[in-house]
C-alpha cells in the first residue's frame, strides 16, 4: 500500500487555508456591518458586496488545482451571500426610483396655489374678495342675522333664496376660532409645507412691480435727506428720482442676496446666515 501521508497533509493544509480565508471574511464583514445604519446606506452595501467578491475570488484561486467538498461548500456560501446583498441593493434602488417617479407625477398633476382645498388646510378668512361665493353668502347671512335682533320665526324658517335651499353649509368638523368683539367665526389659516413659498415665487415671477412699497421708501429717503444734509429740510425730491433710487436699491439688494445664497449653497447649507452676507461684502463689495 502506498503512503497516503502527503495527500492527507495537503488536504489538511487546504482546509486550514479555507478556514483562514473564512475567518478573515467574517472579520471584514463584522467591520462593515458594525457601522450603524449600513443596511440603509448604498455605500455600506456596496462595500459588503466588494468584500464578498474578493473572498470568492480567493477561494476560487485557492481551489484551482483541487476542488474539495469544503471549497465547493464555502464558495457556494459566499456566492449566495453576495447574491442576497446584490438583490437587496437592487430592490432598494428600484423602490427609491419608484417613489421618486410617483412624487414627480403627483407634483405635476396638482397645483398647490390654485388647486381645490381637499385637505381643508387653506383658509379664506383673510378677505372677502378671496372667499368663495357660497361662503361669502353664508357669512353675510350670519352677520345680518346676528346684528338684526328683530328677526322673527318667519325669517328663520328657511333661506330667502329658493335656489339655495337644498345646499348644505360648511361642515361642523372644521376647526374654528372665535375672535373677541366679532360675531363672525373665522378659521385659523394653515399652509402645507412649501405652499407659501410657491405662492410667493409665482407672484414675483408674474409681476414686474417693485418689491418695496413706494410710500415707506419715499419716507425713508426724505428722512435720510433731512438727517444727513444740513439743507435737507428745504429740499424737495421728484417722484421719478425716488423711483430711480428704489430700482437701484432693489437691484443692489437682489444681487447681494443672490451672491450670499450661492455662498450658503457652497457651504452645503440651505439657510442664509449673516456670515454669508459678510463674506459677500468682503469679496464683492470691498469699496463699501
Curated annotation (Swiss-Prot):
Keywords: Centromere, Chromosome, DNA-binding, Kinetochore, Nucleosome core, Nucleus. It comes from the Eukaryota. It holds the Pfam family Histone. Residues 191-288 are annotated as: H3-like. SUPFAM superfamilies: Histone-fold (SSF47113). The lineage of its organism: Eukaryota, Metazoa, Ecdysozoa, Nematoda, Chromadorea. Transmembrane segments: none annotated. This is Histone H3-like centromeric protein hcp-3.
Amino acid at each position: 500500500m502506498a503512503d497516503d501521508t502527503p495527500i492527507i497533509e495537503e488536504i489538511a493544509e487546504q482546509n486550514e487555508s479555507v478556514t483562514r480565508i473564512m475567518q478573515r471574511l467574517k472579520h471584514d464583514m463584522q467591520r462593515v456591518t458594525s457601522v450603524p445604519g449600513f443596511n440603509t446606506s448604498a455605500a455600506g452595501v456596496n462595500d459588503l458586496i466588494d468584500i464578498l467578491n474578493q473572498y470568492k475570488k480567493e477561494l476560487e484561486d485557492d481551489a484551482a488545482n483541487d476542488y474539495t467538498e469544503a471549497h465547493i461548500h464555502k464558495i457556494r456560501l459566499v456566492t449566495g451571500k453576495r447574491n442576497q446583498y446584490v438583490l437587496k441593493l437592487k430592490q432598494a434602488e428600484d423602490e427609491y426610483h419608484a417613489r421618486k417617479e410617483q412624487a414627480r407625477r403627483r407634483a405635476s398633476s396638482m397645483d398647490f396655489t390654485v388647486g381645490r382645498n381637499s385637505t381643508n388646510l387653506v383658509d379664506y378668512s383673510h378677505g372677502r374678495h378671496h372667499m368663495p361665493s357660497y361662503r361669502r353668502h353664508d357669512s353675510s347671512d350670519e352677520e345680518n342675522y346676528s346684528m338684526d335682533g328683530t328677526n322673527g320665526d318667519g325669517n328663520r324658517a328657511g333661506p330667502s333664496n329658493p335656489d339655495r335651499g337644498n345646499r348644505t353649509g360648511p361642515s361642523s368638523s372644521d376647526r374654528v376660532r372665535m375672535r373677541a368683539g366679532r360675531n363672525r367665526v373665522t378659521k385659523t389659516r394653515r399652509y402645507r409645507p412649501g405652499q407659501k413659498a410657491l405662492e410667493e415665487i409665482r407672484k414675483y415671477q408674474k409681476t414686474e412691480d417693485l418689491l418695496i412699497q413706494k410710500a415707506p421708501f419715499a419716507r425713508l429717503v426724505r428722512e435720510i435727506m433731512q438727517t444727513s444734509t444740513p439743507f435737507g429740510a428745504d429740499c424737495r425730491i421728484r417722484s421719478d428720482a425716488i423711483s430711480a433710487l428704489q430700482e437701484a436699491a432693489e437691484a443692489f439688494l437682489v444681487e447681494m442676496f443672490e451672491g450670499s445664497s450661492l455662498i450658503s449653497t457652497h457651504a452645503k447649507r440651505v439657510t442664509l446666515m449673516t456670515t454669508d452676507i459678510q463674506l459677500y461684502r468682503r469679496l464683492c463689495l470691498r469699496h463699501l
